[in-house]
Amino acid sequence: MKQFGFTRLMRLVDPGDFKQIFAAGERVSSKAFTVLYHSNSLEYPRLGMAIPRKHFSRAVDRNRIKRLVRESFRQRQQVLGGRDLVVLSKPGINRHPNSDLLRCLERQWIGLVKQCSDS
């Protein structure tokens, strides 16, 4: 597997996986995103996203947020370890510039790793 790739194996696609994370996952929140996470039996992290149409009326806005989340995850996947992650967006984040959202995601990845190492 490529060191910083984002293959299909790294995506959460099964609805059962999403249900498990929503039911038993822990969370890290910020002004723009909530990240739910749960450990998996794999050696690599997997990412799922819940970016509702209700928060973004235009597809271009939803896709921009998804691209930012994927890119941030791709760059930080080495430190995230074997966890399943679901990123939920909060309303109003489409007004923030990309740099603010990437910074927010970076802080969340750091907080998630710290929270996992503390427990």
From Swiss-Prot:
It catalyses: Endonucleolytic cleavage of RNA, removing 5'-extranucleotides from tRNA precursor. It is an enzyme of class 3 (hydrolase). One of its GO terms (biological process) is tRNA 5'-leader removal. One of its GO terms (molecular function) is ribonuclease P activity. Keywords: Endonuclease, Hydrolase, Nuclease, RNA-binding, tRNA processing. Pfam families: Ribonuclease_P. PROSITE patterns: RIBONUCLEASE_P. Signal peptide: none annotated. Its EC number is 3.1.26.5. GO terms for cellular component: ribonuclease P complex. Transmembrane segments: none annotated. Belongs to the RnpA family. HAMAP family: RNase_P. RNaseP catalyzes the removal of the 5'-leader sequence from pre-tRNA to produce the mature 5'-terminus. It can also cleave other RNA substrates such as 4.5S RNA. The protein component plays an auxiliary but essential role in vivo by binding to the 5'-leader sequence and broadening the substrate specificity of the ribozyme. NCBIfam families: rnpA. This is Ribonuclease P protein component.
